[in-house]
């Protein structure tokens, strides 16, 4: 998904200046923006990354999401250790929320999403924190995207991986 040197294959929905590559990682720092992986869409898939979020920062890993302006329409695996939003890292935003801090700010962690049909699992550092069935199958297919939530948040992503599931 990411070659460690450029944003080839990625496209910001707005404010592309909020995204850079530094030390082999994708860094979000600046005004709100979402960086979409445009290479392929996916329905049943795995999506994972090593992530670090600043103190007070807010971000997310979107999957099965539509490209467009503003906040994407799709599922979001939250990335948030200490932002004022009480929904913390590992939450399936607005579907199944986690309110405890699983990872301190400025600490690398791995977030792993598995989406198969209506079943969604989110793991943080290999521990399952969400095991949810969306009976409505709200979002069945779409892009992957990374979130830069707001100025003052700094998020770093590396070792990004996606894999379609049979």
Question: What do the PLM-derived regions correspond to, one by one?
Answer:
Residues 1-166:
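Carbohydrate-interacting regions of secretory-pathway proteins
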């Amino acid at each position: 998904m990411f070659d460690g040197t450029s944003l080839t294959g990625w496209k910001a929905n707005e404010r592309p200046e909020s995204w850079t590559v530094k030390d082999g990682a994708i860094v979000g720092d600046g005004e709100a923006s979402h960086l979409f992986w445009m290479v392929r869409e996916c329905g049943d898939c795995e999506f994972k990354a090593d992530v670090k979020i600043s103190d007070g920062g807010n971000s997310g890993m979107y999957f099965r999401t539509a490209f467009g302006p503003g906040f994407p329409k799709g599922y979001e695996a939250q990335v948030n250790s200490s932002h004022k939003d009480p929904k913390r890292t590992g939450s399936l935003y607005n579907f199944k929320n986690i309110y405890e801090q699983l990872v301190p700010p400025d600490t690398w962690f791995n977030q792993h999403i598995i989406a198969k049909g209506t079943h969604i699992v989110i793991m943080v550092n290999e521990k399952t924190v969400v095991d949810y069935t969306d009976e409505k199958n709200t979002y069945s297919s779409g892009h992957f995207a990374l979130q830069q939530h707001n100025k003052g948040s700094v998020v770093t992503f590396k070792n990004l991986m996606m894999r379609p599931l049979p």
